[in-house]
A protein has these predicted regions:
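N-terminal small/polar loop signature for handling phosphorylated ligands or for N-terminal nucleophile
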Residues: 38-48, 54-118, 203-261, 409
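Short glycine-centered, acidic/aromatic-flanked micro-motifs in structured strand/loop junctions
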Residues: 57-60, 190-192, 262, 345, ...
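An N-terminal, well-structured beta->alpha segment
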Residues: 1-74, 78-79, 158-188, 394-395
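Phosphate-binding and adjacent anionic-ligand microenvironments
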Residues: 246-247, 283-460
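General beta-strand structural signal in soluble alpha/beta enzymes
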Residues: 6-7, 57, 83-88, 108-109, ...
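Gly/Ser/Thr-enriched, mixed-charge loops and adjacent short helices
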Residues: 1, 43, 119-243
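Proline/glycine-rich low-complexity loops and linkers
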Residues: 93, 137-170, 174, 263-337, ...
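Buried hydrophobic positions in well-ordered alpha/beta secondary-structure cores of metabolic enzymes
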Residues: 9, 57, 94, 107, ...
Length: 460
């Protein structure tokens, strides 16, 4: 059954509109706290901090984060759960600290790459992994119950963890496994998207020996992801060329994704980085299982991996589905074109800083530039058009006769040298129209024609 609030990456929306209101966040904290305590009582939760169950709450740099932090804190306290507040910290840092502190769960206040007017709440399990669908369903069911405050002697307590950033920085450094000399002599430009990694990411690379210049490192609560970060790598590319840097690293607002730029200012996306991670592990004898991409992964990635006898599988779009497929197939590396990359031999969730370190380590081991490392991936032309639709209308539109007929015509024209994909966004009222093939003009023409058909059908 479809969930009312939880999407593919937690709960998300416009601040001040349901469900992103302070009263909802208060109730959400209480409901989640009750569900987690019930799990603990039933013996379904192993990790808890001594005699006082706790959760870790972190956030990115959005102005609204303060409001939701306070509301969630109050909700958990009302349920009788202690709260560890870690402040602005990358999403994967909260996953790591959840395990470190043996908390019942981790809670992240962020809307990832979205603008400041949006925000969201997502949860990590005690193991630092995305919360299971069944637990999210239990939380939604608990939201239907009236909020009942625990007794005055059983209320949760809250405290700030001053060592959170330092702990996370040390964790990131431990995953690098660089050759002797670390990153000495490497010149980096790091774009922190005015987001959660503005303090941690530059420090990680500096402490490993790199020369680091930063952009997008002055958050004011309103400028997160604003013309910067992984969704706007063109500014990073300009800075890399201007400074004569070796590599540029672009994170997003909550720093769970990473896009890179080579020394010539060419953007290197998640598909190309995923190839580099997979080939490096193959050469070091540490690759296990297939590499997992998504339905949106470029055909060029699949062909490059095939040429190296590396198995490739596609999952539904969303890092949680990539994770599930990796676990099911015994794989360790996977990801999305957007830069959500999973290195399960290093971390339990996507981590932009850790992913960048893995690529830099591969460059050092092979004594190659970033451009040379990803050169085997010859990307096929791909056009993606987002069509705004009514909420819940995606299934009806995709089943509409005129849409299906248009898709069939394009597929017949492309034959076995291209792909067509229509899929709804998991977080926004959009239907994504993607066409991929060998000829850029033909691909673009087909994508625009399909998008027009979808728009007309949506307006009918």
């Amino acid at each position: 059954m479809a969930q009312r609030y939880f999407g593919t990456d937690g709960i998300r929306g416009t601040v001040g509109e349901t469900p992103m209101t302070p009263d909802f966040a208060l109730h959400l904290g209480w409901a989640a706290g009750r569900v987690l305590l019930d799990q603990l009582a039933r013996g379904q939760s192993e990790a808890h901090n001594a005699a006082r169950p706790c959760v870790v709450i972190g956030k990115d740099t959005r102005l609204s984060g303060y409001m939701f932090e306070s509301a969630l804190e109050a909700g958990f306290a009302a349920a009788g759960v202690d709260v560890l507040l870690v402040g602005p910290l990358p999403t994967p840092g909260i996953a790591y600290l959840t395990r470190t502190f043996r908390a019942l769960a981790g809670v992240v206040i962020s809307a990832s790459h979205n603008p400041f007017a949006d925000n969201g709440v997502k949860f990590f399990s005690q193991y630092g992994q995305k919360l299971a669908d069944a637990v999210e369903a239990d939380i939604e069911a608990m939201l239907d119950q009236p909020l009942v405050t625990a007794g005055a002697d059983a209320l949760g307590r809250a405290k700030r963890v001053e060592s959170a950033s330092g702990r996370y920085i040390e964790f990131c450094k431990s995953t690098a496994r660089l050759p002797e000399g670390g990153l000495r002599g490497v010149h980096l430009v790091v774009d922190c998207a005015n987001g959660a990694a503005y303090q941690t990411a530059p420090e990680v690379f500096r402490e490993l020996g790199a020369t680091v210049h930063t952009i997008g490192h002055a958050p004011d609560g309103l400028n997160i992801n604003l013309d910067c970060g992984s969704t706007h790598p063109e500014h990073l590319a300009e800075e890399v060329v201007r400074r004569g840097a070796d590599v540029g690293i672009a994170l997003d607002g909550d720093a769970d994704r990473c896009i890179m730029v080579d020394a010539a200012g060419q953007v290197v996306d998640g598909d190309q980085l995923l190839f580099a991670l997979a080939e490096d592990r193959q050469q070091t004898g540490t690759l296990a299982g297939p590499v997992v991409g998504t339905l949106m992964s470029n055909l060029g990635l699949a062909l490059a991996l095939e040429a190296r006898d590396i198995a490739f599988e596609r999952a539904k779009v969303g890092d949680r589905y990539v994770f599930e497929r990796l676990v099911a197939l015994g794989g360790i590396v996977g990801g999305e074109s957007s830069g959500h990359l999973l290195c399960l031999d290093r971390a339990t969730t996507g981590d932009g800083t850790v992913s960048a370190l893995q690529v830099l380590a591969a460059m050092a081991r092979r004594e190659q530039s970033l451009a040379a490392l990803v050169a085997p991936v010859e990307k096929c032309p791909q056009t993606l058009i987002n069509v705004r639709i009514g909420r819940g209308a995606a299934s009806t539109l995709m089943a509409a006769a005129e849409v299906r007929e248009a898709v069939q015509k394009v597929e017949q024209d492309l034959g076995n040298k291209g792909r067509v994909l229509l899929r709804p966004s998991g977080t926004e009222p959009l239907l994504r129209v993607m066409v991929e093939g060998l000829d850029a003009d033909r691909v673009d023409r087909h994508a625009r024609a399909l998008a027009d058909v979808v728009e007309r059908s949506a307006a009918a």
